Amino acid sequence: MKKFSRKTEETEVEVVLGEELKVDTGIAFLDHMLKTLSRHSGIKLRVKAKGDLEHHVIEDVAIALGKALAGVDKKGLERFGDAIVPMDDAVAICGLDFSGRGVLVVEGTFGDGEMREEDFLHFLDTLCRNAGLNVYLSVKGSNSHHKMEAAVKAVAISLKKALTKNGNDYRSAKGVLD
């Protein structure tokens, strides 16, 4: 079980990995995306958050979730994962490296729907930087909800593959992963 708490003047967030699936951020679409991430990654996720502005909650949940994921022991993990996820009119393709180097590269646009594109991309980027995930994500489609959900599912499935235990060594020529 990994836990990370973050309390600032703007937000209060607690993320626990390895417990029951329970998410309450006060932002319905963010809750939906976090539950989707949990279900498709196989990571039991408990998130409780409150804050002054949606943007601050979205950002700080991503920071806390990223820090919790960064605490996972990478020894023996597969490290890499990928997925192609179609969803109605949308499709998302993800390649992921749990390298300790947090980089997000996105090809395509999401548009504004239940969550503004800017906030969605900021969530993904902040998550990647804090977790140490290198994520390449390509998305196509016309419905912003479907594109965002397909993207989260693709990241989740890729993460599930990367977190698969396969031996006792680090998957790195350096012999270590940050």
From Swiss-Prot:
The lineage of its organism: Archaea, Methanobacteriati, Methanobacteriota, Archaeoglobi, Archaeoglobales. The keyword Cytoplasm applies. Belongs to the imidazoleglycerol-phosphate dehydratase family. This is Imidazoleglycerol-phosphate dehydratase. One of its GO terms (cellular component) is cytoplasm. InterPro entries: IGPD_sf, ImidazoleglycerolP_deHydtase, ImidazoleglycerP_deHydtase_CS, Ribosomal_Su5_D2-typ_SF. It is found in: Cytoplasm. One of its GO terms (biological process) is L-histidine biosynthetic process. HAMAP family: HisB. It comes from Archaeoglobus fulgidus (strain ATCC 49558 / DSM 4304 / JCM 9628 / NBRC 100126 / VC-16). Pfam families: IGPD. It is an enzyme of class 4 (lyase). The gene is hisB. It catalyses: D-erythro-1-(imidazol-4-yl)glycerol 3-phosphate = 3-(imidazol-4-yl)-2-oxopropyl phosphate + H2O.
